[in-house]
């Protein structure tokens, strides 16, 4: 069992919580700068751990909220950083409307590899309460999130997130700056929610995207014909694969199909 100790607190690292603690001050500084936070901003940090990012945020924002699931780490943050509003909870269960009672929030954090996608979709569903997200995640996931059409990384995650948010890959973070050292590299991504006409039909659009990509090597026609009336789509569109369509094209396709009854 791997253990990590900092000051007076020692924890047994929980793989299921994705506990890899950032130690490099330069990387921490770059993350805070990338988040573009200002004094008075409402900041929410996901998984503060031993407070490496927490202390850097406090240099800009004298008070903010952090969400930590691990009880020992939550106690550590309360003791070391009393000005931080510590919410001891699973981020997937947090009420973002409550976190944003005083105004929309800027989300930051080194998010666990094991639940990256659920966290991203939790944030997506609560984007009306969010100004921006500056997140460190597994490098491979970051590439998928910011991928362009026609690449092997481009898929459901990219289309669903990029439709409702502006997504930017910022920089890579090597595994050597963590304790314990993970098996893969990380990267920092910035996500900014945007207004779109699809806000009112998000659930059905996301279902459409999942079905379009359900078998990547099949054509759009083969993936959709059992689920939608696709008679308004052209023959050339139907013979293309989902990975070839841009975000704008996906939006146009969605406006011209109808679910089969």
From Swiss-Prot:
GO cellular component: cytosol
Organism (species): Prosthecochloris aestuarii (strain DSM 271 / SK 413)
Pfam families: RrnaAD (PF00398)
Record-linked CDD domains: AdoMet_MTases
Source organism superkingdom: Bacteria
Binding site for S-adenosyl-L-methionine: 20, 22, 47, 68, 90, 110
HAMAP family, sorted: 16SrRNA_methyltr_A (MF_00607)
PROSITE patterns: RRNA_A_DIMETH, SAM_RNA_A_N6_MT
Protein name listed in UniProt: Ribosomal RNA small subunit methyltransferase A
Function: Specifically dimethylates two adjacent adenosines (A1518 and A1519) in the loop of a conserved hairpin near the 3'-end of 16S rRNA in the 30S particle. May play a critical role in biogenesis of 30S subunits.
Record InterPro entries: KsgA/Erm, rRNA_Ade_diMease-like_C, rRNA_Ade_Mease_Trfase_CS, rRNA_Ade_methylase_Trfase_N, rRNA_adenine_dimethylase, SAM-dependent_MTases_sf
Alphabetized GO MF terms: 16S rRNA (adenine(1518)-N(6)/adenine(1519)-N(6))-dimethyltransferase activity; RNA binding
Lineage: Bacteria, Pseudomonadati, Chlorobiota, Chlorobiia, Chlorobiales
Similarity remark: Belongs to the class I-like SAM-binding methyltransferase superfamily. rRNA adenine N(6)-methyltransferase family. RsmA subfamily.
Entry keyword set: Cytoplasm, Methyltransferase, RNA-binding, rRNA processing, S-adenosyl-L-methionine, Transferase
Subcellular location as annotated: Cytoplasm
EC annotation from Swiss-Prot or TrEMBL: 2.1.1.182
Family annotation (SUPFAM superfamilies): S-adenosyl-L-methionine-dependent methyltransferases (SSF53335)
Catalyses which reaction(s): adenosine(1518)/adenosine(1519) in 16S rRNA + 4 S-adenosyl-L-methionine = N(6)-dimethyladenosine(1518)/N(6)-dimethyladenosine(1519) in 16S rRNA + 4 S-adenosyl-L-homocysteine + 4 H(+)
